[in-house]
A protein has these predicted regions:
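Patatin-like phospholipase
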Residues: 1-220
């Protein structure tokens, strides 16, 4: 891996201290925080919640670390947990809608879900380029396809099956690829943040919310 986990862990402890997931649920008012992490040993996504007995003792620091331990960037947490985005929930809007409706029992007509994207990757491939790919050239396009398809799928699921929710998804189009650890791009990322902020103020929704079902013609 590229980076040790200790500096991030120390900063999280500085702000979160010894707070546990269970403490969030016992607070007044109770707070539901759902973090996802992929369990390599069980080969499944785990949903770490403060009201689940098995996760109540977890320090919030551990839940955050387990949720953001990107493979090859950070070490595996507790020998089994990596970034929750490894599964289908890099965009957790469907998870949030499900939690609110079926776990917390909230009235969907009284519930607003705001989903903020981290940037839609630009289209950089030109016709014929893929025909000249070496084996390793396929890695990023395939990973990008999985990630973007899963993210758009979550939006479509919420928009289709939770239609009574006030659901709003905002996403900004990146004009160039930016590596997640490229600190030299912080100013550019901040500019994208301002752009996303204007989209929120203008209620300019992600185009993934425009996906609609095309009805098949009736057979004659």
């Amino acid at each position: 891996y590229r980076y040790p986990i200790e500096p991030l862990q120390e900063q999280l402890r500085r702000y979160l201290g010894t707070l546990t997931m269970g403490d969030l649920w016992q607070a007044e008012p109770a707070t539901d925080l759902v973090t996802t992490t992929f369990d390599l040993l069980d080969n499944r996504t785990r949903f770490v919640k403060p009201w689940k007995a098995e996760y109540a003792p977890w320090p919030v620091v551990q839940a955050v670390l387990a949720s953001c331990a990107v493979p090859t960037y950070f070490p595996v947490i507790a020998g089994r947990y990596v970034d929750g985005g490894v599964g289908s929930y890099a965009n957790p809007c469907y998870l949030a809608a499900y939690e609110a409706r079926f776990c917390l029992g909230w009235d969907p007509q009284e519930t607003t879900i705001i989903s903020l994207g981290t940037g839609r990757l630009p289209r950089t491939l030109q016709p014929g380029m893929a025909e000249r790919f070496w084996t390793w050239d396929w890695l990023m396009p395939v990973l990008g396809a999985f990630e973007q398809s899963a993210a758009d799928q979550q939006v479509h699921l919420v928009d289709t099956f939770f239609d009574q929710l006030d659901f709003r998804r905002f996403q900004v189009d990146l004009r160039e690829p930016i590596q997640m650890d490229d600190v030299g791009q912080l100013d550019r990322l901040a500019a994208y943040g301002v752009e996303l902020g204007h989209m929120i103020l203008d209620d300019q929704l992600d185009r993934a919310m425009g996906i609609t079902a095309l009805r098949a013609p009736q057979p004659e």
